[in-house]
A protein has these predicted regions:
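Beta-strand initiation motifs
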Residues: 17-21, 92-104, 170-180, 223-227
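Beta-propeller domain segments
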Residues: 4, 11, 30-40, 44-46, ...
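Generic structural signal for coil-to-beta-strand starts
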Residues: 9, 60, 137-140, 201-202
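Surface loop/turn motifs at the tips and blade-to-blade linkers of beta-strand repeat domains
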Residues: 23-26, 38-41, 106-109, 121-123, ...
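Asp-box/WD-like beta-propeller blade repeats and closely related beta-sheet repeat scaffolds
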Residues: 74-132
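Beta-propeller domains
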Residues: 2-27
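Aromatic- and glycine-enriched pocket-lining scaffold segments that form the walls
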Residues: 120-146, 155, 160-161
């Protein structure tokens, strides 16, 4: 079983019960290797891992994490455009003791680098991070709104969306969002789960709703999940 720990890294528990620490965050200890660009802050960090459908043949896994590698000037001056969450692809050796050949297949999922009062929230808020392969063979990646009202209804950004991509990060050709062909649906608050109905492949997300009422959403290609927290409105923002 592969798993991630938000502020530590990627590990695997083998059939014998042994735990192998594979790939750590910056300054982590005890891992076979580490990414110096990977960090945790608030709710951000290493948030998800999924095996390739052909893992038994290609030993490939995908990991979702927060990274400083692609921050750029946007993270200092305009955090609507701060690219700080990524999807990485790795090869795992046959003994399940180390990973190699890291490739960043998605580099521009937005991250919140500093605190805001309205909508409120500290650095690293609402990153999503859940991933799953669908019966169609594509990788579905759920992101979050970063507690920023601009995300929900802006389908040019990769916050508040579900991506549907291939193993190299390219959008599925049938995706209907023209602004960015990697996007399958938009208008999500903070995706915490992705699952597919066995009978017909219908995809569902579990995600945060306003206040404490979380929700299950049935996704439709090109659809809008409806999360629209206008900035500076009365009541709760993003």
């Amino acid at each position: 079983m592969f798993y991630t720990e938000k502020c530590k890294g990627l590990s695997v528990k083998t059939a014998s019960g042994k735990i192998n620490a594979l790939y750590g965050m910056k300054d982590s200890k005890g891992y076979a290797s580490a990414g110096n660009d990977l960090f945790c802050s608030g709710q951000a960090g290493m948030l998800g891992v999924v095996l390739d459908p052909n893992f038994k043949k290609n030993n490939t896994i995908y990991v979702y994490s927060t990274s400083s590698k692609y921050h750029g000037s946007g993270c200092k001056t305009n955090f609507e455009k701060c690219d700080g969450n990524i999807v990485m692809k790795f090869k795992v050796n046959k003994n399940l003791t180390k990973v190699s050949d890291r490739t960043d297949i998605v580099k521009d999922i937005q991250y919140k680098p500093f605190e805001s009062n309205q909508p409120f929230g500290g650095p690293g808020a609402h990153n999503g991070g859940r991933m799953a392969f669908g019966p169609d063979g594509y990788l579905y990646v759920g992101t979050g709104d970063r507690h920023r009202g601009v995300c929900g209804q802006d389908n040019t950004l990769l916050c508040s969306v579900v991506l549907r991509i291939d193993g190299n990060g390219n959008g599925a050709p049938a995706n209907k969002i023209k602004a960015d062909k990697r996007i399958f649906t938009y208008g999500h608050r903070n995706v915490q789960g992705i699952a597919f109905r066995p009978t017909d492949g219908q995809v569902f997300t579990a995600e945060h709703g306003p206040w404490h009422n979380d929700e299950i959403t049935a996704l439709v290609n090109g659809g809008n999940g409806g999360w629209d927290p206008h900035e500076k409105r009365a009541g709760r923002g993003a």
